[in-house]
Amino acid sequence: DRIRQTYDYCLIDAPAGLGMGFHLASDYADRAVVVTNTDASSLRDAQRTVMELDRLGRGNLHLVVGRVEKKLLRSLHTTIDDAMDAAGLPLLGVVPEDRNVPYALNTGIPLRECSNYAARAYENIARRIMGQRIPLMRI
């Protein structure tokens, strides 16, 4: 309750899987953002996560699809709509594959200073969480 009184938003990065860390994070969530990649394994994990959140009675669920590569989507004959259908969630945002992201993570340099593209995608997602109507980026 102290956190709710102090902050407008508190983001918790729950661990992969549906173990204790996931349940602890979901117990206090007003909203859940399921983050997935476009590969089949990630989409199956997203489906399981959504099913568990539904079972727990959690609402206000959204999807972020990360590490999106246009060429890979074409070669797999998949689309962002396929990811939305698999998860059964509305899309909050798409993050393009960007090799500057690991560089920023490993060096501690803010992503905004390394990559305008991925940083803009994350900023757009944050703005949508705050209720702003921001168009999706073209990948």
Give, region by region, the residue ranges found by the protein language model.
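Conserved catalytic network of the ASCE P-loop NTPase/AAA+ motor domain
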Residues: 2-5, 26-27, 55-57
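Conserved Switch II/interswitch segment of TRAFAC-class P-loop GTPases
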Residues: 14-19, 28-47
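Conserved C-terminal guanine-recognition region of P-loop GTPase G domains, centered on the G4
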Residues: 43-61
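Phosphate-binding/switch loop-helix module in NTP-utilizing enzymes
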Residues: 1-21
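C-terminal lobe/tail of nucleotide-utilizing enzymes
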Residues: 55-139
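Structural beta-sheet core signal
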Residues: 12, 34, 62-65
